């Protein structure tokens, strides 16, 4: 009965059926959260775990059918490794190796040349959860002084039970599209600690509805505008025949609206977590915070003229996971740049095996490097600082935003088109303008520094 209805809905909306199933599965998290609040909040932990497991498995079955066994196998193996290997480096390395190899094998055997919603999509979220679980269990055996603040907060004092591991993995608010959260936070949710009124369900309905409304607005924008900017048009002769400026503006608008696909899912899923209580983040300046599961800072995403600002506003929990479990654990390298490169390399492999991911993340690293040098130049140059603080700044801001979104869309081309032949065709059609722009900027910034920064300031900077 459901299949024909979904088929008709898919046809009427002009969206693939797997995408319809996915968004419905994210939305059904709201009634699941209400069931938990109304009927299960005061129930024993075992009942809550079973509810999370059954609801998550139901979502997996609805979207991927019998392929849900992939997640079940990985969760069970992870539990066995925690139990049998204990708090050891071997346990962490075994978990990391097994979970990543399973994910990469999934990518390899299900790979196509287009973006498909298949079991590997939620599995990449699960992979980070389970690797993070191994790290957090290992950290629980260390002295707090050996850990960073966020690592100490997530460290597990004891091995979790089988029900805890499965409930944590299949929690309906984060199983399909994230966000990432720790086992400690999940345990606090089940023990009724994540609430603004102790002993009662949290007053989180209004904050959850606000995120739902914002997410739905982003989803509507994606549904309205994305059909006008399809990925496939980038590969057509018609696109190649357009003027250069048109091709660039198309990439700008395409990249902007394409990202709403991710923004909408993450913000709606965040609302589910808030409604259940998992989004509770304590009190700051007398106000209860509900941003523990925030994966997007939408206002910053929309208004920042900086590439670094967009990265800071986008996929926040995944970036925080990478910082906590990869970047900060590479201190032994003694070089932040090397740690940054290694972290980006991990995220590249985690996303998939296509060449487009490598190019996208390498471009991100290069763009951020150039932007930081440009920011330092503006801060050190009296002329540029005065210009940035003058009445001309609104004009400068508009130019910044154009450059920012043009070259945000530019590295997204290989990210979305995946294969060498496709992204090379698009980059050739715009004469590799993004590569050339940032290469030229990288080469001339040292000379601009000599020209625009007083010698005294340059000497002081060198000494620092």
Regions found by a protein language model. Name each.
Residues 1-464:
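Non-catalytic, membrane-anchoring transmembrane segments at the edges
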């Amino acid at each position: 009965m459901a299949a024909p209805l979904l088929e008709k809905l898919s046809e009427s909306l002009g969206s693939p059926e797997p995408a319809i199933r996915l968004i419905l599965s994210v939305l059904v998290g709201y009634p699941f959260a209400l069931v938990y609040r109304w009927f299960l909040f005061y129930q024993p932990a075992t009942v809550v775990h079973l509810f999370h497991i059954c609801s998550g498995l139901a979502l997996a079955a609805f979207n991927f059918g019998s392929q849900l066994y992939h997640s079940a196998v990985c969760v069970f193996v992870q539990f066995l490794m925690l139990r049998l290997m204990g708090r050891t480096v071997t346990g962490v390395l075994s978990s990391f190796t097994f979970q990543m190899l399973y994910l990469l094998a999934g990518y390899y055997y299900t790979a196509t040349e287009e973006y498909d919603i298949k079991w590997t999509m939620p599995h990449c979220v699960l992979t980070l959860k389970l690797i993070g679980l191994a790290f957090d269990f290992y950290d629980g055996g260390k002295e707090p002084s050996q850990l960073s603040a966020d690592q100490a907060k997530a460290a597990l004092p004891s091995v979790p039970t089988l029900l805890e591991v499965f409930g944590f993995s299949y929690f309906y608010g984060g199983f399909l599209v994230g966000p990432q959260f720790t086992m400690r936070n999940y345990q606090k949710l089940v023990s009724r600690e994540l609430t603004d009124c102790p002993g009662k369900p949290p007053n989180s309905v209004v904050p959850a509805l606000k995120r739902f409304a914002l997410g739905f607005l982003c989803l509507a924008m994606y549904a309205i505008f994305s059909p006008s900017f399809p990925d496939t048009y980038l590969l057509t002769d018609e696109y190649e025949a357009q003027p250069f400026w048109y091709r660039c503006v198309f990439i700008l608008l395409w990249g902007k609206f394409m990202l709403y696909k991710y923004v909408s899912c993450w913000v709606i899923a965040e609302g589910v977590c808030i409604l259940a209580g998992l989004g509770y983040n304590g009190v700051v300046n007398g106000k209860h915070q509900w941003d523990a599961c925030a994966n997007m800072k939408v206002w910053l995403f929309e208004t920042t003229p900086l590439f670094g600002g967009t990265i800071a506003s986008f996929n926040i929990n995944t970036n925080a996971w990478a910082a906590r479990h990869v970047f900060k654990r590479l201190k032994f390298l003694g070089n932040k740049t090397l740690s940054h490169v290694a972290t980006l390399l991990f995220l590249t492999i985690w996303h998939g095996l296509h060449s487009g991911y490598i190019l996208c993340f390498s471009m991100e690293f290069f763009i951020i490097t150039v932007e930081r040098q440009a920011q330092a130049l503006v801060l050190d140059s009296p002329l540029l600082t005065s210009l940035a603080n003058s009445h001309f700044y609104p004009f400068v801001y508009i130019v910044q935003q154009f450059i920012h979104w043009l070259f945000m869309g530019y590295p997204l081309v290989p990210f979305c088109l995946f294969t060498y032949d496709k992204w090379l065709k698009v980059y050739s059609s715009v004469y590799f303008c993004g590569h050339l722009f940032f290469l030229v900027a990288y080469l001339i910034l040292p000379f601009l520094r000599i020209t625009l920064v007083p010698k005294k300031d340059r000497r002081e900077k060198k000494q620092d």
